[in-house]
Amino acid sequence: MIEKLSNLLHQRKVFNRITLLMGKEVTIKTAVYTNGRLLIYVDTESHRFTFALTPEDEVQIVAIDDIFSISDLKLQLKIAEIIQSHISLNNHWRDQ
């Protein structure tokens, strides 16, 4: 399941949107979390955003690390929105 999510999030379409939004190179990683949730990490040199994907494919903000301003929080919300919309448009990803 982690590999499927990783493949979905590394499609150029979503990866490019997040990179463009951040204005710098990003790294996206996935990992297992408790209660059937999958963690999604979006890292840059200056920020690390952590999200959880629920079994119902809902993206949730897990941790607010390195948030120093309202603009940082807005950025995290925008990334969550990009990931959520990409997962919603590819709702068959778990079956592949």
Language model features by range: what are they?
Residues 2-8, 59-96:
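Mixed-charge, Lys/Arg-enriched low-complexity segments
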